[in-house]
């Protein structure tokens, strides 16, 4: 299955969505696709006063595709006998604001999805890696994040030059971040941010293999 974690479009005035739609159409005709929003999709939908009707038209078109759109939804599926719960988080916009980290992300997750079922593998699509500690505390087995696009220029495996909220050298631009049996995987992504620049920052497609163990613990390697 294919998990799409958002920012398939670039949310700016006059943005076009045809390429994003074409990509999702081709992908969903071949694979089962689960698609959660990034902040770019979220803002073109929530702010028509800035972006016009492009967000509304984009969402209507995507709804016609053979994929599952996860806007604060969770679905249960089974793959090769392994029970999975896939959650797509679209948080309150304040969690994308610049400045200090906002309180209440765990409560946001509980409000949207309840508590993770310990008898299932819970996969969380949560675009913003700044709240990785909260995702780990909530208890998702694996959380997929992006948002930083590798921080423009990568400095090692995790640290980038700058984040979208203008923090210098953030430590969550890539890599795997673990806590016990839980992991957050941050991808540098396939595209660019609003400014199309990548330095020592190759495009990244994450492939995850989940194997069932008898005790149902699912370590990420």
Regions found by a protein language model. Give the residues of each.
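Conserved beta-sheet core of the metallophosphoesterase superfamily
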Residues: 123, 128-206, 215
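Solvent-exposed loop/turn segments at secondary-structure junctions
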Residues: 8-11, 39-43, 75-77, 91-94, ...
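Active-site neighborhood of phospho(di)ester-bond hydrolases with catalytic His/Asp-centered motifs
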Residues: 1-7, 32-39, 70-73, 123-126, ...
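Acidic/histidine-rich helix-loop elements
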Residues: 8-16, 42-53, 94-103, 157-169, ...
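Beta-strand-turn-beta hairpins that frame and shape the catalytic cleft
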Residues: 67-68, 74-87, 178-184, 210, ...
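Binuclear metal-dependent hydrolase catalytic cores centered on His/Asp/Glu-rich metal-binding motifs
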Residues: 45-67, 79-122, 132-133, 198
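Short, conserved loop/helix-junction motifs that constitute active-site signature segments
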Residues: 24-30, 116, 136-139
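Membrane-embedded segments
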Residues: 1-68
């Amino acid at each position: 299955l294919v998990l799409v974690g958002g920012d398939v479009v670039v949310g700016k005035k006059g943005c076009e969505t045809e390429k994003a739609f074409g990509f999702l159409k081709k992908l969903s005709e071949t694979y089962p696709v689960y698609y959660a929003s990034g902040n770019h999709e979220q803002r073109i939908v929530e702010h028509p006063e800035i972006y016009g009707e492009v967000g509304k038209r984009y969402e209507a078109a995507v709804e016609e595709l053979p994929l599952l759109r996860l806007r604060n939804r969770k679905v249960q599926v089974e793959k090769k006998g392994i029970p999975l719960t896939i959650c797509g988080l679209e948080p309150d916009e304040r969690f994308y604001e610049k400045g200090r980290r906002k309180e209440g992300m765990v409560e946001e997750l509980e409000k949207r999805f309840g508590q993770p079922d310990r008898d299932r593998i819970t996969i969380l699509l949560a675009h913003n890696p700044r709240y990785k500690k909260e995702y780990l505390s909530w208890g998702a087995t694996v959380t997929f994040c992006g948002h930083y696009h590798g921080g423009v220029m990568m400095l090692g495996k995790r640290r980038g030059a700058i984040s979208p909220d203008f923090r210098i050298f953030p430590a969550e631009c890539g890599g795997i971040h673990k806590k016990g049996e839980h992991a957050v995987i941050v991808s540098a992504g396939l595209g660019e941010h609003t400014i199309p620049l990548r330095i020592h920052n190759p495009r990244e497609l994450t492939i995850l293999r989940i194997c069932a163990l008898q005790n149902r613990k699912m370590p990420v390697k």
